[in-house]
């Protein structure tokens, strides 16, 4: 009668009632600790084992295996007594938080060794946690793959757009070049190929500032050029009509006309690179055409005229050839006249050489100024060419025999 039923206390050995030296903690009250262990409020301080066993539990703090562990009241997580004493500092005024769920006022209780049912429940919970972690990881990987796919699609679309633009630009450039080549290259049968690249027009409003005074000066120059041209035509018609009649052989020898080389100073032009060469060639062409219109039987032995815009080397070579031919015939004429003193020897020596050459007229050079500025520049160049021709070209003496 009067006996009280209760749980039988576990008999704990004395050596398990004090710390085993896992941590160096001098603030532990050994007497109080022993009392709590004897009263089964804390788990005994068993020595931890490194190897796992089916009867042992692992402490998630020190990762050692013990026969029994304490349990957190907040989250029911297991922890050994020495780790709990390390977390729960008795001299600290701040409340201790749970190392697992961060709940304040951390406290534990000892329930003894876990039963099979409790171990099964813990395993199920652990499995759920693992599955949840796996699902989260898979979702993160799927999101990363979707982002990468979107980036690849955007990059491929931008690359295809750039490729299309490049192809369109290349085809348009090829078509433009083919059109330019077809328009610029004009093949001829008896003359060389003449190329004249069209210069693109630009906005010259900022570069060219032509006032009224300059326009009047240019107009006066143009009028003077026209007057000089008419005078030059009349003078050249009288000079170039020279024929040497030979009464003995009833034949005549035509003296070749004097072609005056016109060399313009090679100064760079802001309007076009080859404009000065083109203007010089046009001026010479006009002079040669005017002289040949009065004398149909006198032609200059010029094989071909080929002039590229911006390059006057071939033009100067042609002039030097023409000058050399004239000088050769002129010196030969005077030398033979002085040696024999008669026209018969000159005629015979001149006629015994190569026969008369029918020199084809040079092909026409079509140069059309594009703007008023180029027209004024052409007028000035023609005027300079005419003045240079009148000052440097001496009239050829005509001797009738």
Curated annotation (Swiss-Prot):
Changing residue 91 to L: No effect on E3 ubiquitin-protein ligase activity. Signal peptide: none annotated. Residues 139-164 are annotated as: Disordered. Pathway: Protein modification; protein ubiquitination. GO terms for biological process: protein ubiquitination; regulation of organ growth; regulation of seed growth. GO terms for molecular function: ubiquitin protein ligase activity; zinc ion binding. Its EC number is 2.3.2.27. Disulfide bonds: none annotated. A zinc finger (RING-type) spans 59-102. InterPro entries: Sip5/DA2, Znf_RING. Residues 139-153 have a biased composition (Basic and acidic residues). 'Da' means 'large' in Chinese. Plants overexpressing DA2 exhibit reduced organ size, biomass, and seed size and weight. This is E3 ubiquitin-protein ligase DA2. It comes from Arabidopsis thaliana (Mouse-ear cress). The gene is DA2.
